[in-house]
Amino acid sequence: MTDFDKPRESCGIFGICDHPEAAPITYFGLYALQHRGQESAGIATIRGDTIIEHKGMGLVSDVFDMSHLNVLEGRSAVGHVRYSTTGSSVLTNAQPFLVRHRKKSYAVAHNGNIVNAHTLKDELEESGSIFQTTMDSEIFLHLFVKNLEYGFEQALVKSVSRLQGAFSFVMLTSLGEIIGIKDPYGFRPLCLGKLNGSYVLASETCAFDLVEAEFVRELDPGEIVIIGPAGIKSIKTSPATRRAFCTFEYI
């Protein structure tokens, strides 16, 4: 079995829902989060009823120019900058990670580590899953797709409940929804903001400052937020009995 990536202290994630300049705003959000990752950068957005993306190796300013942003024309977007370390530094492992399932698309950007990744991957491969990367992030999408038989919200809850570790996710659906997920310990940061009536999610509030978004709150430990054109819904899963923090988040 191919080993997963080595642990990363931090990556940067950003998402915005229902804004006419979603991709350019995500670009600037990632630019503000560049200190969290310099290995690769990517943005996913919607075209019609599917998700398209552009990603590459290097800094945000190296990966994107106006021609790329003009193609990424959807009203919702998620983005990712990846922490640089030795090993697995290949474009295949750049995020957001995109999957298509039964005429729908999902793209996920992930910060953190899933410590039971090997066990879950073995289980998923035994049941027929085929992995395209060495990212533990991909495990979440495989779990999510398998749990969709229980409905969209329960698929999120059931999938997150299987994960152990320190993590936060932003996910884009082909319906234009943005989902934010925070681990039960609240180990990895994820902030909620507003920009001219649109909701934004980011690893740090410095991304809000650059795009002139208003900070609303930090997501609670174990919280899932589902953001669509009609508004926002919060799902509180079971948080850990104590909150934990990552020392690297305070450097």
Language model regions located:
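Conserved short alpha-helical segments that host acidic/polar catalytic motifs at enzyme active sites
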Residues: 1-251
